[in-house]
Regions:
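Short, well-ordered coil/turn segments that N-cap beta-strands
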Residues: 2-6, 29-31, 59-63, 84-86, ...
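Short beta-strands and strand-loop turn motifs
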Residues: 3-9, 33-38, 115, 134-141
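Active-site mouth loops of central-metabolism enzymes
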Residues: 4-17, 44, 62-70, 91, ...
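Generic structural signal for well-ordered alpha-helices
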Residues: 15, 19-23, 50-54, 76, ...
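Glycine-rich, proline-tolerant flexible connector loops at the mouths of alpha/beta enzymes
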Residues: 33-48, 90, 140-146
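Alpha-helix-loop-beta-strand connector modules within alpha/beta enzyme cores
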Residues: 46-67, 104-113
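Conserved anion-binding
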Residues: 74-77, 82-146
Length: 146
């Protein structure tokens, strides 16, 4: 059985105190930092960018990047700062070719994850499971804290 992990979300972090907040969380020993990327197309909100992710790579704690964006294959090349300790998670519903996108993530040497929206049946993941390191089953429609 796989172990669970603690991955606090940075979506609601106070950007004026982000360094201090991250340092406090690192002291208590979190496993990952969850970074929500939103594009105002796949979901009706905009949050943290690839530039923010690049800045976060200065910390020791790995990143759990949740891409809530249309056509993630267009943004993934901007995440070459990620490494084998990080996870990049795409939404099944965000691309016509999820397995191809997952393969491109793994080709970068990064762990790959797949997320599904609440209305998406879990059975769509059957053929994808061998290609992922993580599955995220949303319990709320993506786009906002919840």
């Amino acid at each position: 059985m796989r172990k669970g992990y603690v991955s606090p979300s940075l979506m609601c972090v106070d950007l004026m105190n982000v360094q201090s907040d991250i340092e406090k969380l690192e002291k208590v020993g979190v496993d990952y930092f969850h970074v929500d990327m939103m594009d105002n197309h796949f979901v009706p909100n905009i949050t943290l960018s690839t530039d923010f992710i690049k800045a976060l790579k200065k910390i020791k704690t790995p990143l759990d990047i949740h891409m809530m964006i249309e056509h993630p294959e267009q943004t993934i090349p901007e995440l070459t700062c990620c490494d084998e300790n990080d996870i990049i998670c795409i939404h099944y519903e965000s691309t016509l070719h999820p397995q191809k996108v997952l393969a491109s993530i793994r080709a970068m040497g990064v762990k790959a994850g797949i997320a599904i929206n609440p209305a998406t049946p879990v059975c769509v993941l059957e053929d994808i499971l061998p290609d992922v390191d993580m599955v995220l089953c949303m319990t709320v429609n993506p786009g906002f804290a919840g």
